[in-house]
Amino acid sequence: MFPIEKIKEAKYISIDTETCDPNLKTHGPGGVRNDGHLAGISIATDNGVNDYYPIGHQTGNLNKEKVKDLMLEIFKSKKTLIFANALYDLEWLMTLDNKLKVDQNSWVYDIQIIEPLLDENNRKYSLNNLSQKYLREEKYEDQINMEVSNRFGKRAKVKENLWKLHPSYVKGYAMEDARLTLEVFKKQMARVKSDKIEDIVEFESKLIPLLLDTRLKGVRVAQDRAETLYIELKQKQELSQKILNKRASTDINVWANASIKRAYDKESIKYTYTDKGTPSFTQAWLEVQKDPISECILEIRKLDKIRNTFIKNMIMEKATKGRIHCQFHATGTVTGRFSASNPNLQQVPARDQELAPLIRDLFLPEEEEDWVCADYAQQEPRVLVHYASLKNIDSALTARDNYHQDENTDFHQMVADMAEIPRKQAKTINLGLFYGM
């Protein structure tokens, strides 16, 4: 049924999955939550095999156990496996059988990880974009777009409805994805060799199994405690809102400038205006005010953000069986630093002396283990200063000398002093520029 012997003779095997993943956009991939299912698997090899194996369409599927056995044979063969968005496909493949797992001894590559190593400023790493760049080809989607539109309406999304179609409509589309991935990889590796960055590509590729393990294991969270804290902070926010409303003699919406204006007018407190003459109450302005109205507004906003962004959205809505399964993205920033999503565990509050400890205590280490916090000190500023100083830029030379003389030199404060703005604003702008804003 399957050309297993020919597949085993291949050097490279490209793999792509089609899925039913209903909550992908709101909660991230559903494989780890068992939320949705694997619809089919396409492969392409460097010796001519290119096929699609449907197992989760509404009709027309192959025998699921036989497809699983085929994939187990492929993974046991220790061939070089090629993906476009490997972590997504590997997560879903493990729902078919947890033995379909890669480790540090596996040869796994992701063309969407290789490409930023070749051109970190491109920022467009979809399979379609890479196919256009390297192959002068585009994914053939006209037929499947038409079929999805005819069956499910003009606004229906292809990826969300593929699994509902008979595999005969999906086969060509899925096979093309696997083929294009393989062909792009070949072109990329020629450039990798030319640019002499094989070691970097190997290093980043070896992170794929580690990041998959991190994703699947997740982080323990105290769900019950989170729900209790959410209620407590809600009550505290409501009390602050009552105090603000009482001072203003009217209900105040702390997110609407027109409403905030009434509170300041009631207390005869002066405020700033925009260039167009409308009242302005920026966060930076509020933070330097000493009046009770400003303090109330800041408190309400802070409590609202803590409750909804961190407790509700990050824990209460994302936790699965007492764990949250964050996605880490190895090439999420142009500097090579990880980014994270669903939820972003890199943005857990740390500075607020009252609320930050309460939020961080909701994230639990494994039994009989402790958390360890390690961080590079201003790594992007140091790299920037190094390369800028090679151009003999005066301010960069000064910054370089400052770093050499004092390891605690604060780059963001230097920029803040130069621009005459608060350090917090300088840091936000600096990091945005470093990460590709």
Label for each model-derived stretch:
Residues 93, 114-117, 181-185, 260, ...:
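Buried hydrophobic packing segments
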Residues 370-407:
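Structured ligand/cofactor/substrate-binding pocket environments in proteins
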Residues 189, 211-212, 413, 417, ...:
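Amphipathic alpha-helical segments within well-ordered protein domains
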Residues 204-207, 423-427:
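Short, leucine-enriched amphipathic alpha-helices that occur as contiguous helical runs
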Residues 1-55, 122, 133-135, 142-355, ...:
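Conserved "right-hand" nucleotidyltransferase catalytic core of DNA-directed polymerases
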Residues 425-435:
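Short, amphipathic alpha-helical "recognition" segments used to contact nucleic acids or chromatin
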Residues 406-424:
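Generic long, charged, amphipathic alpha-helical segments
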Residues 1-129, 133, 234, 351-356, ...:
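Conserved RNase H-like, two-metal-ion catalytic cores of nucleic-acid enzymes
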